Every structure is written in structure tokens, then in C-alpha cells.
Regions:
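Bacterial N-terminal signal peptides that target proteins for export
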Residues: 1-8
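N-terminal signal peptide c-region/cleavage motif recognized by signal peptidases
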Residues: 15-16, 21
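Residue-level detector of alpha-helical transmembrane segments in integral membrane proteins
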Residues: 10-11, 30
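Small beta-barrel nucleic-acid-binding modules, principally OB-folds
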Residues: 13-14, 135
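Extracytoplasmic copper-binding redox domains, predominantly the cupredoxin/blue-copper superfamily
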Residues: 21-223
């Protein structure tokens, strides 16, 4: 076998997973058909090598949690840096993860491990209007929509998937089934409608009761 042929075959083997992989480009909308940001789509599908869970990051900027919704795989460690020039006191009473990071600036020395699937509602004990969410899932493939309601998932094994959808404004904060999806090689496009009336209000504008209401919904959903 010539050196050129051996090199060509080696490159083909390395490229094969990406050549045979599927991609999903999805548009998430509310019940009025408007783009829905901060919505989670997750996929459970064929057995195969799942992407390695990357560390998560939930920042605090301008007295807001950024991003408003963070999706992570079960077992992910999440850091909570404070980029503001004032101190924050982050906490959650949600059944999926109870924790407290007392008044601090900068970045706490240890991240928080999210080892139970579910919705974790975040608040700040100093700034009552701050509200954020960590969506913890066992599904290996997931993404959060941007302000235009768009998501893209790449390097998916071709096959049949079960789709789950979630948004903070869903009734009882329970995930919504998105049906089944058959993905072949290449790019597929889908549109999903979630049963919510409007997109999430801009973080920082929520009334002071929002954390209590959101926590109660997450607690009830876990029961």
C-alpha cells in the first residue's frame, strides 16, 4: 500500500464520524408562534458515544443571572462567578439541589455539583428580583434557545430520538413532550411550539415574589 493511500484511508477513518453524523436545527416558539428564548430542548436517542459533559458557568452581571437559563447534564459542576462590583448571596431551596453561596465577590473556590435531574431555581438573598434556572437533565444532547428561538445540535448519531421541551413558564414547570424524531445523516430542521403565553420577562424586571413562586412550582414538579 502506498504512503499516499495509507494516509488517505487514515484521514477517512478520522473524518467518518462527522461525515455520518446528524445535525438538528430547531426553532422554538410560544403558543402565539413568536420566537421563544431561554427554552430547553433535549434528546434521548440511540446508544452511542454521548458528548462529554463540560463544566457549567452561571455568571452574575448587572444584578442578573447570566444566562437566565442554563442547561447541564446530570453530574455537571457549575461555577458561579460574580462579575458585579457588589456582593451577591446565591442560593436555592429546590429539591434537585439545595445550596448556598454566602455573600461573595469574584469566583467561589469550589463549583457546585448538580447530581440530580430536575429544575433548580436560583435566587439572591440580597437582590430579591434576581431569578435564574439550572435545568439538569439525564439526556445526553440538549441546548438552550437564543432570543430568536433558535438552537442547533451537531454530531448526533443518526437514529430515532425522543424530544423533551422545557421553559420556565410551562405550567407547573414540567417538561413538555416533543414527540419522536428520526434523524438521518446531514442537517434536519424542525419547529416546536411550547404551551406558554410569552417569552421569559427580562431578568431584573421580575417582581419580588417571582423567586417564591418559581421555587414552589419547581418543588411541586419534583413531587
Amino acid at each position: 500500500m502506498s504512503v499516499f493511500r495509507a494516509l488517505w484511508l487514515g484521514l477517512l477513518v478520522l473524518a467518518a464520524p462527522s461525515l455520518w453524523a446528524a445535525s438538528l436545527q430547531a426553532e422554538l416558539v410560544d403558543s402565539a408562534g413568536q420566537p421563544l428564548g431561554s427554552a430547553v430542548i433535549s434528546l434521548q436517542g440511540p446508544l452511542g458515544e454521548a458528548p462529554q459533559a463540560a463544566p457549567g458557568l452561571m455568571d452574575q452581571r448587572a444584578q442578573q443571572f447570566v444566562p437566565h437559563v442554563l442547561a447541564v447534564r446530570t453530574g455537571t459542576a457549575v461555577s458561579f462567578p460574580n462579575s458585579d462590583d457588589i456582593r451577591h448571596h446565591v442560593y436555592s431551596f429546590s429539591p434537585a439541589k439545595r445550596f448556598e453561596l454566602r455573600l461573595y465577590k469574584g469566583t467561589p473556590s469550589a463549583p457546585v455539583l448538580f447530581d440530580t435531574p430536575g429544575v433548580v431555581v436560583l435566587g439572591c438573598n440580597i437582590h430579591d428580583w434576581m431569578l435564574g434556572y439550572v435545568y439538569v437533565t439525564d439526556d445526553p444532547w440538549f441546548a438552550v434557545s437564543d432570543e430568536q428561538g433558535r438552537v442547533q445540535l451537531d454530531a448526533l448519531p443518526p437514529g430515532r430520538y425522543r424530544v423533551s421541551l422545557w421553559h420556565p413558564k410551562l405550567a407547573d414547570m414540567l417538561s413538555q413532550p416533543g414527540g419522536e424524531l428520526q434523524l438521518g445523516e446531514g442537517l434536519s430542521t424542525q419547529r416546536y411550539s411550547l404551551a406558554v403565553q410569552a417569552a421569559v420577562a427580562a431578568p431584573g424586571s421580575a417582581p419580588k415574589s417571582s423567586f417564591g413562586d418559581a421555587f414552589k412550582q419547581a418543588r411541586d414538579a419534583a413531587q
